[in-house]
Amino acid sequence: MKRTIALSLLAAGLTLGGSAMADAVVGQAAPAFKGVDAAGKPVSLDQYKGKYVVLEWVNPECPFVKKHYDSGNMPTTQKYAVDKGVVWLAVSTSADGDHAGKSAAINDWVKAKKAMPAATIMDTGGAIGKAYGARTTPHMYLIDPSGKLVYAGAIDSKPSANPGDIKGATNYMVQAIDESMAGKPLSQAVTKPYGCSVKYG
């Protein structure tokens, strides 16, 4: 009897977890969202309608994020995208609000790393992350001007925290932007993200 109850509770937990976390599907409309950035300004996906949009899940304390920022790889990728007219939005998902002054800290970090996001969205409570199924930092998404999700996954092909691996890696985001803008099918539209787990509480 106890085993039956335990299995029932486990099944219920899995069902609840599945309903809470929904993966955005490549080839379908990207989930709409509204949020507030680290400067306290409102941000929504709708305001960038008609443009390419990158979503990058970020955590400055994550070794995998540090790999791409300390090396300059992520800021360089951001500049490449922005120079092509792409809107780059960073997303910081957390379950514990802004009690530790995360907004101010992440603003300082963005400036120190010479990063180029149009905004860093403070996803307190994790609603945006859950809508997209964001699992790691970094976890990358590319949305085309029609609002369709065209890429979801890793920043590159080397799933490690070693900066030395960047040189020999395929930058999936650059590849996705180039191929999508050229009207080509993406070589890799979905890849496995790697990094630190996004914390939903």
Where are the model-predicted features located?
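Bacterial N-terminal signal peptides that target proteins for export
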Residues: 1-8
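N-terminal signal peptide c-region/cleavage motif recognized by signal peptidases
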Residues: 12, 17-19
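Cleaved targeting-peptide boundary
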Residues: 19-30
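A short beta-strand-turn-helix
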Residues: 33-53
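Short active-site neighborhood of thiol/selenol oxidoreductases, capturing the structured segment around
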Residues: 46-66, 177
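Structural microenvironment flanking redox-active thiols in thiol-disulfide oxidoreductases
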Residues: 66-113, 124-131
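Short, internal strand/loop/helix patches
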Residues: 107-150
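Thiol-/selenol-based redox modules, centered on thioredoxin-like
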Residues: 142-201
